[in-house]
């Protein structure tokens, strides 16, 4: 009976040790970050120490089981108690290992977070130091410069210089010359003034030409009427033919004179490249009649010769 009580007391102590490890986190909650990290570190150290204490406990339990088995008469009951104790000891050891691993992972994550925070703070400090150093270098260079600092103003307007004006005018003139020298596939455009002037000139030339022809016909008719009869024995129809041919030659001679020029033959002053407008010569009834009479007189002459 005493052996069973001792055996139960040993198993109870081992179980209480495991439960104490699991519920060892009870206590006042930490208020700051430093206190929380300290509590995590303490719990990890405590779990690791309890895991280390399992070894001597297991050794002492094994020695006690061996002595009990040798000196006890109920060996079967000792073996059953030993199996139960071994299972509980194994479960408790695994529980201690899990607790230690969890505590270690938590502590590692906390340390990694603290390290990343410190790295961020160090990077911010380095950036601030670099900014201060750059500003210090610029300020030192500015103070070491011998020349005075000139005030800078924003340019609202850009005034071209004289050379730029000359170059711009020369480029515009060259562009205009290139455009004028290019061949155009269509005729050049006429202005309204050019059309009005050409229309006025054509009307004036037509009126003058008609007046000139009428005056010539009037002048030739009285001359032919007042002309003395020739002494040659020409027939009357031959004399009429001769008068009409003289009149036609006179008109042709007047038109072919180099001094007589029409206004329509000159090009316009507004557009020197424009086409020259020339009007066809007017043919009066007397000229046509002269040609017809000439043919008739030729036929009659041939008949008279026969």
Curated annotation (Swiss-Prot):
GO cellular component, one term: cytoplasm
Keyword Cytoplasm annotated: yes
Its job: Involved in regulation of actin and microtubule organization. Part of a WAVE complex that activates the Arp2/3 complex.
Family from the record: Belongs to the ABI family.
Keyword Ribosomal protein: no
InterPro entries hit by this protein: ABI
Region (Disordered) residue spans: 200-236
Name the UniProt record assigns to this protein: Probable protein ABIL1
Localisation: Cytoplasm, Cytoskeleton
Signal peptide positions (record): none
Keywords, alphabetical: Cytoplasm, Cytoskeleton
Main location class: cytoplasm
Subunit structure: Binds SCAR.
């Amino acid at each position: 009976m005493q052996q069973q009580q001792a055996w139960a007391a040993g198993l109870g102590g081992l179980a209480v040790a495991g439960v104490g490890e699991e519920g060892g986190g009870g206590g006042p909650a930490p208020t700051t970050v430093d206190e929380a990290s300290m509590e995590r570190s303490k719990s990890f150290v405590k779990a690791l120490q309890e895991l280390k204490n399992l070894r001597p406990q297991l050794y002492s339990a094994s020695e006690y089981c061996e002595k009990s088995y040798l000196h006890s008469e109920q060996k079967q009951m000792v073996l059953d108690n030993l199996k139960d104790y071994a299972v509980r000891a194994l479960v408790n050891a695994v529980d201690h290992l899990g607790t230690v691993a969890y505590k270690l992972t938590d502590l590692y994550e906390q340390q990694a977070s603290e390290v990343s925070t410190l790295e961020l703070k160090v990077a911010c400090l380095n950036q601030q130091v670099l900014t201060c150093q750059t500003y210090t270098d610029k300020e030192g260079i500015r103070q070491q410069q011998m020349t005075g600092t000139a005030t800078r103003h924003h340019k609202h307007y850009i005034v071209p210089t004289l050379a730029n004006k000359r170059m711009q005018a020369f480029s515009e003139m060259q562009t205009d010359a290139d455009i004028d020298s290019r061949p155009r596939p269509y005729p050049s455009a006429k202005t309204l003034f050019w059309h009005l002037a050409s229309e006025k000139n054509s009307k004036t030339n037509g009126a003058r030409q008609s007046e000139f022809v009428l005056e010539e016909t009037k002048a030739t008719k009285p001359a032919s009427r007042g002309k003395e009869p020739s002494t040659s024995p020409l027939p009357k129809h031959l004399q009429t033919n001769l008068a009409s041919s003289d009149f036609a030659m006179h008109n042709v001679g007047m038109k072919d004179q180099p001094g007589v020029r029409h206004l329509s033959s000159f090009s316009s002053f507004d557009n020197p490249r424009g086409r020259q407008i020339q009007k066809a010569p007017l043919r009066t009834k007397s000229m046509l009649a002269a040609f017809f009479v000439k043919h008739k007189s030729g036929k009659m002459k041939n008949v008279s010769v026969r």
